[in-house]
Amino acid sequence: MNHFIGIDMGGTNLRAAIADTDTGQIFHQRKCPTLAAEGQEAVIQRIVQLIRELTQANGASGAAITGVGIGVPGTPDIETGVIQFLPNLPGKWLNVPLQAIIEDQVGLPVALINDVRAITLGEWTFGAGRGADTLVCLAIGTGIGGGVVVNGQFHLGLGGTAGEFGHHVVEPDGLPCGCGGKGCLEMYASGPAIAAMGVKEVMHGHTTRISELVDHDLNRIDAGVIVRAAQEGDPVAQGILQRAGMYLGIAVGNILGVISPQRVIFGGGVSSAGDLLLRPIVQTVNERVHVIPLQKVEFVLAELGINGGLVGAALWAKRRCDGR
């Protein structure tokens, strides 16, 4: 058995588990609040504590933990293990040598990877990407990230940055983004962007189920509320998802023209909207893309859910330990 720890470093929660990288099965899941506002050191110590808890829990099985993979919501240098930039996490996460810091404290090899690249690796190996030679994965949540497999190879690009689809420009001179650019996809189709559209609709006085679901408290509106209202048939909420899907479709169309994948996988919390989001994405792609054989492209939802990033992070740790 190949047992590795996979960790998902989320903006709200830190999640961790032991994964059997031969089967994709996970054991001993743990979760704790990230509480990023308390600072880097506090977050790092929570990660260290999760690793120690899992190492102890795994001891009874007789299988040793070989390494640790951490999916981070930003740009880690996969060679050096230094976090270069985390735009969606509070605090100064610039040039933080996270890999070395944690290795020193837990005595295990640690490998960093972008969180959505981890999801991509998990889905390709054990989920919705199985059997595909070339695919693209997008995860839509607090931000929008992606991952790429080309001709049977997990493609990471320069420094592991291939797949930053959330920062494709879909509106020139549009809204300012946390990355420093303007008009990025994240500003129009991420979870916070969808929530902001919901708040705007309520403030404009439109009658909508969105307001009822939060007892008219605008501060409680998030993407999950919009998705729920849309699933209950609310036309305003459905219109919001239609608009977000249009922007996603523009970005996906551009991606298709560059990579020409067999399969496009959609994951992340917002993908729980299912066809309410997938339909406008595919509609926009069909309207805008005319040089790719779209009848051969599959548009599917991720299968592994919240476990995809954990499995993928563990798989990445195995690859690094194997020298790949």
Mark where each language-model region is.
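Glycine-rich phosphate-binding loop and adjoining helix at the ATP-binding site
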Residues: 40-48, 52, 64-67, 74-134, ...
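Glycine-rich phosphate-binding loops at beta-strand->alpha-helix junctions
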Residues: 13, 71, 78, 261-284, ...
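Short glycine-rich, Thr/Ser-proximal phosphate-binding strand/loop in the N-terminal lobe
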Residues: 3-45, 49, 82-85, 160
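Glycine-rich phosphate-binding/hydrolytic loop that grips phosphoryl groups
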Residues: 111-124, 253, 271-324
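Glycine-rich phosphate-binding loop of actin/hexokinase-like ATP-binding domains
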Residues: 130-189
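Glycine-rich phosphate-binding loop plus the immediately following alpha-helix
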Residues: 110-116, 170-206
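A mobile "lid/hinge" subdomain adjacent to the ATP/sugar-phosphate binding pocket shared
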Residues: 188-265
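Short glycine-aspartate micro-motif
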Residues: 4-8, 64-69, 135-139, 145-147, ...
